[in-house]
C-alpha cells in the first residue's frame, strides 16, 4: 500500500488523484494515455493467491503495459516518506537503461521546480535495483516522487485537490517539453 501520512491518508490515494488529473491534462493535449490502475485495486492476476504472488504479478503486469509499445513513456506517480519530517520537494527518478529517461526526468523536475516549487533544489536521480520497474525498463521511464507525506506542511498540500491539479499540470508541462524535444 505504500507510505501512510501522519494523518492516516495513504500514499496510494494521493497518487491516484494526481494520476487522474495528469491523465486528464495529457488527454486534453491530445496524447494517448493508459493508466495502469484506475481504482484502489491491484492489477495482479486472479490466480495469484499470496500477497507476495499478488505484488509480483502486479509488477509484471505494469511492466507488460509499459513495454507494449516502443513509443511509450512510463510515468509513475508516488509520494515520499522519510524519518526526517523537514524534508520536502518533488524528486524524479529515472531508468538507467535509456538516455531519454534522464531527459524526461530533467524536463519534469525543471518544470515542477519552475512552476510550483521555486525553492526546490532537488536533482534527478538514476534508479537503482530497488525501483524494479525503472531498473528493468527498456522504454523511457521515470518515477515522480511528488513530495513527502512525512512533512506535515507538504502533506497538507499533497492532499489538497487544487495543489494536486497544479502538480499534475507541472508534470504534464515537463512531459510536453520532453515530447517537443523529440519532435524537432
Regions inferred by a protein language model and the residue ranges of each:
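Mature extracellular/periplasmic domains of secretome proteins
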Residues: 56-71, 131-136
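Structural recognition of the beta-strand scaffold that forms the well-ordered cores
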Residues: 32-37, 73-77, 91-94, 141-145
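A short, glycine/acidic-enriched catalytic loop
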Residues: 1-9, 80-107
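Active-site-adjacent mobile loop/cap segments within catalytic or ligand-binding domains
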Residues: 76, 83, 122-184
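Sec-exported extracytoplasmic/periplasmic mature domains
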Residues: 20-31, 38, 67-71, 79, ...
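Active-site-adjacent substrate-binding region
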Residues: 100-126
Amino acid at each position: 500500500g505504500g507510505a501512510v501520512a501522519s494523518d492516516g491518508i495513504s500514499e496510494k490515494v494521493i497518487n491516484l488523484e494526481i494520476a487522474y488529473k495528469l491523465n486528464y491534462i495529457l488527454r486534453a493535449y491530445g496524447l494517448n494515455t493508459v493508466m495502469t490502475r484506475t481504482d484502489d485495486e491491484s492489477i495482479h492476476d486472479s490466480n495469484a493467491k499470496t500477497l507476495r504472488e499478488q505484488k509480483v504479478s502486479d509488477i509484471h503486469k505494469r511492466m507488460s503495459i509499459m513495454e507494449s509499445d516502443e513509443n511509450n513513456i512510463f510515468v509513475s506517480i508516488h509520494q515520499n516518506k522519510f524519518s526526517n519530517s523537514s524534508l520536502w520537494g518533488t524528486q524524479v527518478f529515472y531508468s538507467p537503461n535509456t538516455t531519454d529517461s534522464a531527459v524526461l526526468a530533467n524536463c519534469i523536475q525543471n518544470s515542477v521546480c519552475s512552476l510550483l516549487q521555486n525553492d526546490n533544489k532537488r536533482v534527478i536521480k538514476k534508479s537503482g535495483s530497488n525501483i524494479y520497474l525503472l531498473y528493468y525498463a527498456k522504454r523511457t521511464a521515470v518515477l515522480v516522487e511528488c513530495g513527502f507525506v512525512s512533512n506535515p506542511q507538504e502533506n497538507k498540500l499533497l492532499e489538497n485537490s487544487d495543489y494536486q491539479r497544479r502538480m499534475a499540470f507541472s508534470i504534464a508541462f515537463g512531459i510536453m517539453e520532453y515530447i517537443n524535444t523529440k519532435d524537432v
